[in-house]
Amino acid sequence: MELPLGSDLARLVRVWRALIDHRLKPLELTQTHWVTLHNIHELPPGQSQIQLAKAIGIEQPSLVRTLDQLEDKGLITRHICVHDRRAKRIMLTDMADPIIQAVNDVIDQTRSEILNGITPEEVSELATIISRLESNILSLYEMQS
Protein backbone atom coordinates (compact mmCIF):
# COMPACT_ATOMS: atom_id res chain seq x y z
CA MET A 1 0.00 0.00 0.00
CA GLU A 2 1.34 3.42 -0.95
CA LEU A 3 1.79 6.04 1.72
CA PRO A 4 -0.52 9.07 1.45
CA LEU A 5 2.50 11.38 1.19
CA GLY A 6 0.67 14.29 -0.41
CA SER A 7 -2.00 14.26 2.30
CA ASP A 8 0.64 13.93 5.02
CA LEU A 9 2.60 16.90 3.66
CA ALA A 10 -0.56 19.00 3.30
CA ARG A 11 -1.58 18.17 6.89
CA LEU A 12 1.91 19.03 8.17
CA VAL A 13 1.83 22.42 6.44
CA ARG A 14 -1.68 23.06 7.79
CA VAL A 15 -0.83 22.31 11.45
CA TRP A 16 2.53 24.12 11.23
CA ARG A 17 0.79 27.20 9.85
CA ALA A 18 -1.94 27.00 12.51
CA LEU A 19 0.71 26.92 15.24
CA ILE A 20 2.51 29.93 13.73
CA ASP A 21 -0.81 31.81 13.47
CA HIS A 22 -1.55 31.00 17.13
CA ARG A 23 1.86 32.17 18.30
CA LEU A 24 1.77 35.37 16.23
CA LYS A 25 -1.71 36.29 17.49
CA PRO A 26 -0.33 38.43 20.39
CA LEU A 27 1.46 40.52 17.72
CA GLU A 28 -1.82 40.76 15.76
CA LEU A 29 -0.16 39.10 12.78
CA THR A 30 -0.55 35.84 10.88
CA GLN A 31 1.81 33.50 9.09
CA THR A 32 0.75 35.16 5.82
CA HIS A 33 1.73 38.57 7.23
CA TRP A 34 5.08 37.15 8.36
CA VAL A 35 5.89 35.60 4.97
CA THR A 36 5.06 38.90 3.27
CA LEU A 37 7.05 41.04 5.72
CA HIS A 38 9.97 38.62 5.60
CA ASN A 39 10.13 38.78 1.81
CA ILE A 40 9.83 42.57 1.74
CA HIS A 41 12.64 42.74 4.31
CA GLU A 42 14.92 40.31 2.44
CA LEU A 43 14.39 41.67 -1.08
CA PRO A 44 16.05 44.89 -2.26
CA PRO A 45 14.01 47.96 -1.18
CA GLY A 46 11.24 49.24 -3.40
CA GLN A 47 10.08 45.99 -4.96
CA SER A 48 6.88 46.15 -6.94
CA GLN A 49 3.80 44.20 -5.90
CA ILE A 50 4.34 41.99 -8.96
CA GLN A 51 7.96 41.23 -7.98
CA LEU A 52 6.93 40.52 -4.39
CA ALA A 53 4.12 38.18 -5.47
CA LYS A 54 6.57 36.24 -7.65
CA ALA A 55 9.09 36.01 -4.80
CA ILE A 56 6.43 34.65 -2.45
CA GLY A 57 5.00 32.36 -5.13
CA ILE A 58 1.44 33.70 -5.18
CA GLU A 59 -0.72 35.64 -7.60
CA GLN A 60 -0.71 39.42 -7.25
CA PRO A 61 -4.44 39.70 -6.41
CA SER A 62 -3.89 37.31 -3.48
CA LEU A 63 -1.14 39.59 -2.18
CA VAL A 64 -3.16 42.82 -2.29
CA ARG A 65 -5.37 41.99 0.72
CA THR A 66 -2.33 41.15 2.86
CA LEU A 67 -0.59 44.36 1.77
CA ASP A 68 -3.75 46.33 2.62
CA GLN A 69 -3.68 44.83 6.13
CA LEU A 70 0.03 45.53 6.61
CA GLU A 71 -0.46 49.09 5.38
CA ASP A 72 -3.39 49.56 7.80
CA LYS A 73 -1.07 48.42 10.62
CA GLY A 74 1.49 51.03 9.55
CA LEU A 75 4.14 48.43 8.66
CA ILE A 76 4.44 49.19 4.94
CA THR A 77 3.78 51.98 2.48
CA ARG A 78 3.01 51.70 -1.22
CA HIS A 79 4.12 54.32 -3.71
CA ILE A 80 3.36 54.71 -7.40
CA CYS A 81 6.43 53.85 -9.47
CA VAL A 82 7.80 56.87 -11.32
CA HIS A 83 8.71 54.73 -14.36
CA ASP A 84 5.41 52.83 -14.53
CA ARG A 85 2.41 54.54 -12.97
CA ARG A 86 0.51 51.24 -12.96
CA ALA A 87 3.06 49.65 -10.60
CA LYS A 88 3.30 50.20 -6.86
CA ARG A 89 6.57 50.03 -4.94
CA ILE A 90 6.47 48.59 -1.43
CA MET A 91 8.56 49.97 1.42
CA LEU A 92 8.80 48.97 5.06
CA THR A 93 8.13 51.70 7.61
CA ASP A 94 10.24 52.39 10.69
CA MET A 95 7.51 50.67 12.73
CA ALA A 96 8.20 47.42 10.87
CA ASP A 97 11.75 46.79 12.14
CA PRO A 98 10.91 45.90 15.76
CA ILE A 99 7.87 43.91 14.62
CA ILE A 100 9.95 41.92 12.14
CA GLN A 101 12.47 41.15 14.89
CA ALA A 102 9.70 40.04 17.28
CA VAL A 103 8.13 37.86 14.58
CA ASN A 104 11.48 36.33 13.67
CA ASP A 105 12.04 35.48 17.34
CA VAL A 106 8.66 33.71 17.47
CA ILE A 107 9.37 31.86 14.21
CA ASP A 108 12.89 30.82 15.29
CA GLN A 109 11.65 29.57 18.68
CA THR A 110 8.75 27.69 17.10
CA ARG A 111 10.98 26.11 14.45
CA SER A 112 13.43 25.03 17.15
CA GLU A 113 10.64 23.41 19.17
CA ILE A 114 9.14 21.71 16.12
CA LEU A 115 12.53 20.25 15.19
CA ASN A 116 13.23 19.07 18.74
CA GLY A 117 14.60 15.51 18.64
CA ILE A 118 15.39 15.68 14.93
CA THR A 119 19.07 15.78 14.05
CA PRO A 120 20.55 18.40 11.71
CA GLU A 121 21.40 15.55 9.33
CA GLU A 122 17.76 14.44 9.26
CA VAL A 123 16.62 18.01 8.61
CA SER A 124 19.15 18.29 5.77
CA GLU A 125 18.02 14.99 4.28
CA LEU A 126 14.38 16.07 4.49
CA ALA A 127 15.20 19.38 2.78
CA THR A 128 16.97 17.48 -0.01
CA ILE A 129 14.00 15.17 -0.51
CA ILE A 130 11.54 18.08 -0.53
CA SER A 131 13.69 19.87 -3.11
CA ARG A 132 13.74 16.78 -5.32
CA LEU A 133 9.97 16.37 -5.02
CA GLU A 134 9.49 20.03 -5.98
CA SER A 135 11.83 19.64 -8.94
CA ASN A 136 9.94 16.56 -10.13
CA ILE A 137 6.61 18.38 -9.84
CA LEU A 138 7.89 21.44 -11.72
CA SER A 139 9.26 19.17 -14.47
CA LEU A 140 5.84 17.58 -14.83
CA TYR A 141 4.26 21.04 -15.20
CA GLU A 142 6.77 21.96 -17.91
CA MET A 143 6.08 18.73 -19.79
CA GLN A 144 2.36 19.46 -19.84
CA SER A 145 2.61 23.04 -21.07
From Swiss-Prot:
Subunit structure: Homodimer.
Span of domain HTH marR-type: 2-135
UniProt note: phenotype after gene disruption: Loss of prodigiosin and carbapenem production.
Keyword field: Activator, Antibiotic biosynthesis, DNA-binding, Repressor, Transcription, Transcription regulation
Cysteines paired by S-S bonds: none
Entry GO MF terms: DNA binding; DNA-binding transcription factor activity
Sequence similarity: Belongs to the SlyA family.
Gene Ontology BP term (one): antibiotic biosynthetic process
Cited function: Transcription regulator that can specifically activate or repress expression of target genes. Participates in transcriptional activation of pig (prodigiosin pigment) and car (carbapenem antibiotic) gene clusters.
NCBIfam families xref list: PRK03573.1
Residue ranges for the DNA-binding region feature of this UniProt entry: 49-72
Protein name: Transcriptional regulator SlyA
Pfam name, any one: MarR
